[in-house]
Amino acid sequence: PRKQKPWADITNDLVDGKLDIAILWGPLAGYEAKKAKKPITIVPLTKEETVSRGKLVYRFTMGIRRNEPEWEKTINNLIKDNQEEINEILRGYGVPLLDNLGNPLK
């Protein structure tokens, strides 16, 4: 049968001792770790690279329509002005956050 949330199954297997280690996408790993029955340590893989996909760290991005520089400026200013609040929301969901150099944010 097809799994709807394999990351949740992986996290449960980790908590239940069926796995010693798991590699998951950071936002999903953090979210599941926050809900887990036992503490789980999240370690961002910031320096590792894979053969097929390269680096494992990348930024979230937003896209806008071309030729709308004022809208782009508005969005960029909203993000910049609200970055701490955005970070707090993401932290609330357990999302591991990194600075521009790939170092974990406190």
Identify the meaning behind each predicted range.
Residues 1-106:
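Proline/Glycine/Serine-rich low-complexity intrinsically disordered segments
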